[in-house]
Amino acid sequence: ILPTVHGEKVVLRLLGSGEKTLTLTNLGFPENKLKVFRNWISKPYGMVIISGPTGSGKSTTLYAALQEIQSETINITTVEDPVEYQVPGINQVQIHETIGLNFSASLRSILRQDPDVLLIGEIRDEETANIAVKFSMTGHLVFSTVHANDAPSTIMRLLDLGIPAFLLGASLNLIMAQRLIRTIDPDHKEKYTPTDKELRRINFPKDKVKSTQFYTGIPDRSNHNTGYKGRTAIHEIIEVDRHMKQLIFDNSNQNEIFEAARKNGMTPLRNAAIEKLIVGTTTVDEVIRATVED
């Protein structure tokens, strides 16, 4: 709630109950990226970080990841603010700042509960960041989120929080930046020819123009007169292999990390959105809205 000169401005965050059952297979991952993500979340220790703005589906992806690896033999504990969905078989802790139960206090207690996997809703400060690193380097798997624009800047953000480069490089397994883009209503769509200006704006591959059939949504009551129905995720993944770890140890800048990750197979968010455009899932307007040029 925000008081303004014309009265109270209220924003409601609605959580759909249907999202509880989402699995990794229906979160928009291309097959190759899904294979990479599954590989790293199955490791016995290290950190998996998902970054993006508020409302980019980070928590949904983390819940799906936990459900993927969950078993009776794995002790999974989460620290969240708030607990968005209750997951059977997982120990979920709700933050209560008013009684002193913040992220760092909760984590100090959880370390004595012998968890195998820890989910930290968000790394917000230096103490939380260092506890996460310490936990991941003592034989535990840590999942968390960070507010950052893309995967390379996530590394910079974690360094800014005070994590020493040698510890960050040693503890990271994978970083994934994520965005949500709206999908065209499959029952109300039509063929569309974008202008040369639109294609140049998103740097659409020239060799793909003739072979791509573009679509736009038709506004209808069933899609709330938007032409869109539902959303899908796009992902930008950095696998923190030996070469990437060395770049972090050397305090390489963001551009150097970006170029190295791209050479190692990272698909930037803009390119990931264009892939959805090529297969007719979304529109040029959504690519422009959700991503920026590399």
Segments (PLM) and residue ranges:
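Short, flexible helix-loop junctions that flank or precede catalytic/ligand sites
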Residues: 1-294
